[in-house]
Each structure stands twice: as structure tokens, then as C-alpha cells.
A protein has these predicted regions:
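Long, low-complexity, mixed-charge
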Residues: 1-73
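Conserved beta-strand/loop scaffold segments within soluble protein domains that form the structured core
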Residues: 59-305, 309-312, 333-351
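A generic "cationic amphipathic patch" detector
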Residues: 2-31, 91, 126, 150, ...
Length: 351
């Protein structure tokens, strides 16, 4: 076992805030073996099992990148060369025999393409486990790509995840992130808006319970003119769960008339849960627009009382409030079966 520091912010702030990175003490390296529990829905034959080493500008850290490149037990490449009519769905299920997953997903979306890609991580309730994953997306000009990553792992498995994307001229990308699982749930997201009028939306929800530790580090860099970034994050914490949110929008030289905004809101469902946030706007270009906000609060007593006057218990009323805050992200996923799966998990985890 060893101590490990990961998920560094692109610009450091005072150590007193305790948010520049996250330290995991007594980190235990996994024993990696074959992973067999994977289900793929790919009606248009876009997926192949192909190993490609990935380079990350940020990511979680050298240890996790090297592990993914050298020791992965699932490697998938998704080639999108047309406008797909049906979604691609990849589902990993961790169980007692498949409790260590090191997966790489490489998405290559060519110019003028369209795709809806959904990746789901699930697990049995009782197992300990380990997940280190990377999703890398190269999005060509005038493409329209929606990537959904759904983390429904239990609260005993350590979850480490990196998302990396490069977005070209006039392409539209939406990343929907559902972050519910993981004893440690540490996520690094990076998007490079390289092309003129490229758009990147990141819509994320998180839910923490028990003693979960959530560390979200979302970084976007705008290079192209008239690029647009929209980061919307909503979460809830109960029991002794703790969350760090770090959101960075960086306007690079040349990104004239670019726009970027980020908003994060955390609902505290207990007096022992804890939330920290660090929103950052960085800029080396004059003619841009940027805005950010973060807020943390408890459930509004008046709203809670109003719902309970309708004969609804306090627990069910809080579930309704949380699901209402999550609704826009869940509805944006489009696949009704996945929506219902997420809503059921909200109910189960808030019981």
C-alpha cells in the first residue's frame, strides 16, 4: 500500500483550501485479470476491439495513464463514419469474478457524423473492486456527438475515470455524466475546443452517500473563434459524503468572441455531508464572455413543507426534490430505459 496524490487542478490555489488535488492514503494496487462481463449494443457495427495508447493533457495522473495504456483488460474503438440512427450502448457489470476493470474507449467521429454513445458501469452491491477508465473522443468538423457516461457502481469500489476530447470546426458535443458510485469517485474531464464555432456542453449530476469521496475536475480550453462551453453540474450529498468540484474554463489566445459558462449547485441532505468548490475562469484573449457560479445549500424548508402537506413523507419529498434537480440531465439522455434505471438508483440510494 502507498499514498497517492491525483487529479491536480490546472492552476494551483492556496493549500489551505485543500482542493488542488485529492490524496488517497493506503492505496492498494489491484490484481488485474481478464474482464468478461460486458454487454454491447452496436447495431451499426461501429465497435472493434482495438488497442490504442492514449495521451492525456491532464488526466488523473501518470500512474493511472500508464496503467490504462499498459495493463488494460478491455479496449474498444468506436468508428463513426456516418449519421447513426440507433444508439451505441456499452454496459460493464462488475461482480465477484470480474471486480477489476481497466478500460479504454476510443471514439473517432469523422466529419459530418452523428452518434449517441452510452457507457454504463454497474456492480453487485456486496463486492469490493477497482475501476480505472479512459474515454477519448476525436470529434471531426460539423459532427454532432452525444456521449453519456453512467456510473452506478456500489460504494465499495474505487472509481477513477478520465474523459478527453478534441472538438473541431462547427461540431457539437454533449457529454452527460452521472456520478453515483465509488468509495472514491475521482473524475477528470478535459475538452479542447480547437475548431471555429465548436460547442462543448457538459451536463453532470452526482449523488454521494455513506462516506463516499467525490472529486470532480472539469477542464475546458477554448482555442477557436466563437467557440462555446456550457458546464452545468447538480448534485446531492447525504450521510458523511464529501465532494470537491473544480471547474476551469480557459480562454486561449485566438478564441475571439468565445463564450463559456459554468454553474454548480450542491444540495446537502445531512449536517455531516460536506461540499467544496473551486470555479475558475482563465483568459489570455480580450474579446470573450465568461461566467461562473457555485452554491451549496440544504433542502428548502418551505418547499419540503409544501410537498409534505400533500401526504408525502419527508424521505419521499426529499427524493422528489433531488430528482427534480437532476431532471434536465436525465431527460437529455433520451433512452427511456436508461432514464428509468437512473431514477431507480436515485430512489434506492436515498432510502
Amino acid at each position: 500500500m502507498k499514498n497517492i496524490v491525483l487529479n491536480e487542478t490546472p492552476v494551483r490555489t492556496s493549500k489551505n483550501y485543500g482542493i488542488n488535488n485529492i490524496e488517497i492514503k493506503d492505496f492498494e494496487e489491484p490484481v488485474i485479470k481478464e474482464f468478461k462481463n460486458i454487454k454491447i449494443t452496436d447495431n451499426e457495427n461501429c465497435i472493434s476491439s482495438e488497442k490504442e495508447n492514449i495521451n492525456l493533457k491532464f488526466g488523473l495522473g501518470e500512474y493511472f495513464l500508464n496503467q490504462s495504456n499498459e495493463q488494460s483488460n478491455v479496449d474498444l474503438k468506436i468508428n463513426v463514419d456516418k449519421k447513426l440512427k440507433e444508439p451505441i450502448i456499452i454496459e460493464y457489470n462488475l461482480d465477484k469474478s470480474n471486480n477489476v476493470l481497466i478500460d479504454n474507449i476510443n471514439i473517432n467521429a469523422k466529419d459530418n457524423t452523428k452518434a449517441n454513445i452510452i457507457v454504463i458501469y454497474k456492480s453487485a452491491d456486496e463486492i469490493n473492486g477497482y475501476h480505472n477508465g479512459i474515454c477519448n473522443a476525436e470529434i471531426g468538423a460539423n459532427a454532432n456527438i452525444h456521449v453519456t457516461i453512467v456510473n452506478l457502481l456500489n460504494t465499495k469500489i474505487n472509481n477513477f475515470y478520465s474523459v478527453n476530447s478534441n472538438i473541431e470546426d462547427e461540431s457539437k458535443s454533449l457529454f452527460s455524466m452521472v456520478e453515483f458510485g465509488g468509495k472514491y469517485n475521482v473524475v477528470n474531464y478535459y475538452a479542447k475546443l480547437a475548431g471555429y464555432k465548436s460547442v462543448n456542453k457538459l451536463h453532470s449530476i452526482y449523488l454521494g452517500k455513506e462516506e463516499q469521496r467525490i472529486d470532480l475536475n472539469y477542464i475546458t480550453e477554448l482555442y477557436g473563434e466563437k467557440t462555446n462551453v456550457d458546464i452545468e453540474v447538480n448534485g446531492a450529498l447525504k450521510d458523511k459524503a464529501k465532494k470537491n468540484f473544480k471547474g476551469t474554463i480557459d480562454f486561449k489566445t485566438g478564441s475571439k468572441k468565445a463564450k463559456g459558462k459554468e454553474n454548480e449547485y450542491c444540495t446537502l441532505l445531512s449536517d455531516t455531508s460536506y461540499s467544496k468548490a473551486l470555479p475558475m475562469l482563465l483568459c489570455t484573449e480580450d474579446d470573450v464572455e465568461g461566467e461562473h457560479s457555485t452554491a451549496t445549500g440544504k433542502v428548502d424548508d418551505n418547499e419540503l413543507f409544501y410537498i409534505m402537506t400533500r401526504g408525502i413523507s419527508e424521505k419521499e419529498a426529499k427524493k422528489m426534490i433531488v430528482k427534480a434537480k437532476f431532471n434536465s440531465v436525465i431527460q437529455g439522455i433520451k433512452e427511456e430505459e436508461i432514464q428509468n434505471l437512473i431514477l431507480e438508483e436515485v430512489d434506492r440510494r436515498l432510502d
